């Protein structure tokens, strides 16, 4: 119970703190400077949220650490394809994966109080799943951002798993990679469902 209260208090508190003390600085920034500034803040936020949950993260590379280092040095845009077990997947990925990246998310999240505003400043892409025409425009925007060198996380299951198992991948999940030629980096999250399942 204590950890749950601490986690949600920090979640709201850090967003409020960011809006008051960090977000105004973005008014004087643009382009890559804005993106890098927000990404650095997000990395600290991710680790703080994992700490608040009482969890520990171990990053295991499957013979790909050198490749990740090369991606960092070359500032290469990649598409991270990850399973989606829990809301805590977001801070885990942001805090512990050694790259700057944003997320491909559903359109509705752009209007969420506090979180939506930070996601927009974080250069997230919002896809309209219900409007195919708008969805195509969103995809074109995403392609341009990837060509600029920005990496993105995609949850190909479309939403969090209801039972901890990997769900069927949605059609079009790999379209960004195929249309841009960006390298795909697979990521497997293990144990986050036990920390915070969809039902909790």
Q: Which residue stretches match the model-derived regions?
A:
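A transmembrane-helix-recognition feature enriched in membrane-embedded lipid enzymes
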Residues: 1-59, 117-118
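Conserved H-X4-D acyltransferase segment
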Residues: 6-10, 42-105
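Short gly/ser/thr-rich secondary-structure transition/capping motifs
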Residues: 55-63, 135-136, 190-196
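Membrane-embedded segments
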Residues: 74-76, 85-137, 141
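Residue-level preference for the first positions of well-ordered beta-strands
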Residues: 77-79, 151-155
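Short glycine-rich anion-binding loops that position phosphate/pyrophosphate groups of nucleotides
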Residues: 84-86, 157-161
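A cross-family acyltransferase "interaction/gating" segment
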Residues: 114-117, 147-153, 162-200
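Cytosolic, positively charged, low-complexity intrinsically disordered regions immediately flanking transmembrane
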Residues: 139-140, 146-148
């Amino acid at each position: 119970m204590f950890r749950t209260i601490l986690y949600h208090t920090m979640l709201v508190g850090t967003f409020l703190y960011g809006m008051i003390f960090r977000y105004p600085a973005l008014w004087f920034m643009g382009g890559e400077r804005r993106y890098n500034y927000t990404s650095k803040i997000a990395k600290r936020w991710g680790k703080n949220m994992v700490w608040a949950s009482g969890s520990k993260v171990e990053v295991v590379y499957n013979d790909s650490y050198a490749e990740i280092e090369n991606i960092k040095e070359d500032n290469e845009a990649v598409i991270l394809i990850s399973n989606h077990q829990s809301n805590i997947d977001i801070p885990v990925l942001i805090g512990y994966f050694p790259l700057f990246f944003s997320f491909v998310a559903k359109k509705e999240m752009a209007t969420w109080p506090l979180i939506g505003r930070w996601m927009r400043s974080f250069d997230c892409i919002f896809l309209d799943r219900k409007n195919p025409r708008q969805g195509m425009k969103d995809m074109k925007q995403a392609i341009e951002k990837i060509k600029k060198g920005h990496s993105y996380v995609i949850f190909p299951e479309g939403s969090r798993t209801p039972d901890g198992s990997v769900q069927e991948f949605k059609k079009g999940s790999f379209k960004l990679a195929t249309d841009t030629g960006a390298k795909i980096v697979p990521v497997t999250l293990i144990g986050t469902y036990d920390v915070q399942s969809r039902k909790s």
